[in-house]
Amino acid sequence: GNTSGVNLDAAGQAVMDAMKKCNPEAVWVIQAWQDNPRVPMIQNRKAGDMLVLDLHAECRPQWGADWSEWYRKDGFMQHDWAYCMLLNFGGNVGLHGKMDILIDGFYDAKADARASKTMKGVGITPEGIENNPVMYELLYELPWREQRFTSSEWLKEYVQARYATDDATLHQAWQLLGASIYNSPKEKTQQGTHESLFCARPGLDVWKASAWAESKDYYNPKDVM
């Protein structure tokens, strides 16, 4: 948005004051998306008065990962924050996930001297649910596991828990899914699953349906079909 002429520090304090007036124990839950929350709006707020949701941490983390497109040098400063997975955009239905990045990002944040001090947990921030349940299972196990693990290791246990059997065919199928369509690479910042070209405006050079989507495979389709 356009912040021209807005005293962001004063605006942030006004919001905080209004919340505290209604409830002295109020905590401002705020989303981290692109340039928001603006640094001047939050830098002078008291520690403990705010919880920042790192909305798209599995793809564009803002807690301080220097490889991120939305890198913040100082992360969320003194404020508490949650490591969140967005995963689903617009309620689109399709297989998609970033298993390795989700796992490594969480443990990288735990190992970071600054980010680890204020990380309070994990969260989900999807625009649609009832698909890709394996990703939510994975996310919510992260805080319970002290040591870093691989997606391949985790999927072995997931298969046994889900199907109550140690079937080799099931293991093979999930290992293929976990290494392909559920392991979108770091450089892919598409917003959720592939979109159908039939949803795009007709044209001779159409290859995606929306500005932030993809239709080009980052995996071998033979591993999914």
Model regions: which residues?
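Catalytic-core regions of glycoside hydrolase
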Residues: 1-178, 183-191, 198-224
